[in-house]
Regions:
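Context-dependent free N-terminus signature
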Residues: 2-3
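EF-hand and EF-hand-like helix-loop-helix modules
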Residues: 25, 39-43, 53-58, 69-74, ...
Length: 175
């Protein structure tokens, strides 16, 4: 403990972002039709600031050649300015790929996993440590069960309002 600066400091610039910048970033990700695993070059397409991309890449990818776009986008959505409702709306819209105002259970499960991993990674200062902690504690399985119990395994019509209620019931730390 105390042997160095946490890598989560690499994400500090995002705490200065306004909510509109986050929503614009999320929309750009969709408009560019980028993959879920981003190379450093693809991440530069999104963020444009090469110094920030290097920090983000170091935090999320470590020694890997790609980073999880969804984990990065969820982290940015959580760290940037805005109210709890604005954060929820940003997260929901990030996973509403068809732009119909609804997500399905599978998308909600992935979103929740990404959000929990983002929280843990920032707290632990390391994505790999967060992944290990999640595996050890069967977090992904618990999230899947929670979502499926609420919406059913084939839930297709989860609206923003349903999502907000779900977050308050299950994950009210966004409040």
């Amino acid at each position: 403990m105390g042997k160095g600066i946490s890598k989560s400091a690499h994400l500090a610039p995002f705490t200065e972002w306004e909510r509109k910048a986050v929503d614009d970033l999320l929309q750009k990700y969709k408009d560019e039709d980028l993959p879920f695993g981003l190379s450093e070059k693809q991440a530069t397409t999104l963020l444009t600031d090469e110094a920030l991309v290097k920090k983000v890449f170091e935090f999320f990818a470590g020694g890997d050649k790609t980073l999880s776009a969804l984990e990065m986008l969820c982290s940015v959505a959580l760290l940037a300015g805005g109210s709890a409702d604005e954060r929820k709306a940003s997260l929901f819209n990030a996973f509403d790929f068809n732009k119909v105002g609804k997500v399905c259970s599978a998308e909600l499960i992935i979103m929740c996993i990404c959000v929990v991993k983002a929280y843990m990674a920032v707290l632990l200062g390391d994505v790999k440590a967060a992944e290990e902690a999640m595996v050890t504690k069967d977090v992904e399985q618990a999230i899947e069960e929670t979502v499926n119990n609420k919406f059913g395994a084939d839930g297709e019509d989860i609206t923003l309002e349903s999502f907000k209620e779900f977050v308050v019931e299950e994950f009210d730390t966004l409040e």
